[in-house]
From Swiss-Prot:
Disulfide bonds: none
Site entry: Transition state stabilizer: 78
Pathway noted in the entry: Porphyrin-containing compound metabolism; protoporphyrin-IX biosynthesis; coproporphyrinogen-III from 5-aminolevulinate: step 4/4
Catalytic activity: uroporphyrinogen III + 4 H(+) = coproporphyrinogen III + 4 CO2
Lineage: Bacteria, Bacillati, Cyanobacteriota, Cyanophyceae, Synechococcales
Protein name: Uroporphyrinogen decarboxylase
Any one GO molecular function term: uroporphyrinogen decarboxylase activity
Amino acid sequence: MTEANDLPYLLRVARGEVVKRPPVWMMRQAGRYMKVYRDLRDKYPSFRERSENPDLAIEISLQPWQAFQPDGVIMFSDILTPLPGIGIPFDIIESKGPIIDPPIRTQAQVDQLHALDPESSLPFIKTILGTLRKEVGNQSTVLGFVGAPWTLAAYAIEGKSSKDYKVIKQMAFSEPAILHSFLDKIAEAIAVYVRYQIDCGAQVVQLFDSWAGQLSPQDYDTFALPYQQKVVKLVKEIHPDTPLILYISGSAGILERMGKSGVDIVSVDWTVDMADARQRLGKEMKVQGNMDPGVLFGSQDFIKERILDTVRKAGQGGHIFNLGHGVLVGTPEDNVRFFFETAKQVDQLL
């Protein structure tokens, strides 16, 4: 039996232990702001190759670990990665983002989708997560991640990134039965995928429902929340002790609803004051976040001030320090280094 204090720091906090400082990692900590990543991208221009070739995905996942020693190392992947495994092919064009052609628009297309068998369709995930666990040992927590049903449905139905989500909203409000049957199938597949990631070594898994912030609260309750809850329920039946995090961009209007999803930790974006978030979610709910990633373009004194402000507002215990969104392209690497160094000494600075 592993002693609690032998477990990695972030995992201990995610499970409810109170420690001297909040653990720290960054969404998108492996990526284009790092020169080593850009050099690798120039050599391997296909995003899918970088995220699905185990050697490359492992190397990229470990780049921020080697540079900054964050308390969390997240698998380098994409939220769309499991879709071909249920019958939805996609491609990622470097300047345009994901393309799904043909997009899902009819009940007949939904009916043709099949269950996810990750062992056969996503075998590289086992290699990536297993190797990351070996590489970081108990020095850091290995995180898996998935897209939540509404957001994956938005990509699959729109066929690409969208500014107004007109196509999926048209389906939601004129043919809701098609959308509900699609969301249900995605929820089952994502639950299988999360369980597989945990089986392969993920110690914490983050669900990204990036586009659920585009929904009104009543539509969130209809089209996003029930399917988040289904994923969480199916995962917790098999892995009750694995902490789950939910992140939504632009979530100020639905924050309390996120707390009803069943996850252990709500990742708060920077548009919500952290003290308000803690009050709105209740003291039992753990939180993650939520410094504005734009702060990392400021002076080091300013960055330090904002780190301390966020940690102070989050209060004692139940907080994983992070940005309120992914780190931005062009962020100075020295400022990222300073962010991690400062966050790791925060108990001495407050």
